């Protein structure tokens, strides 16, 4: 399963913290595991794909470093996937809200600038 995050999502502080916390040695350790069928790829745009093991037993280190990014420790892979999807959805909603606010501010500034020139 391959999940691609847009570059605007990668610029958010939570996504940057995720990139920082997934250090190279953790990624290499997960590549060496023999359970490649139980893993997913997270591919950030303009970044190399990172392999994260979905198995809860072997992902204790990743789970503790993500600070609640994944669901609580369960044996269900669907809960982890749903948690990841909901986190991405909430990040995209935050980014959309920020863009709407910036658009409104720019519109107000342009209108006040053009109205001020008429006088």
From Swiss-Prot:
Domain of life: Eukaryota
Principal subcellular localization: membrane
Spans through the membrane: 96-113
Membrane topology: Single-pass membrane protein
Keywords for the protein's UniProt record, in alphabetical order: Cell membrane, Developmental protein, Membrane, Transmembrane, Transmembrane helix
Acyltransferase found in the keyword field: no
GO CC terms, sorted: plasma membrane
Region (Required for DVL/RTFL small polypeptide activity): 83-114
Gene Ontology terms describing biological process: negative regulation of cell population proliferation
Locations listed in the record: Cell membrane
Entry function: Small polypeptide acting as a regulatory molecule which coordinates cellular responses required for differentiation, growth and development, probably by restricting polar cell proliferation in lateral organs and coordinating socket cell recruitment and differentiation at trichome sites.
Homology family: Belongs to the DVL/RTFL small polypeptides family.
The protein, known as: Small polypeptide DEVIL 24
Annotated source species: Arabidopsis thaliana
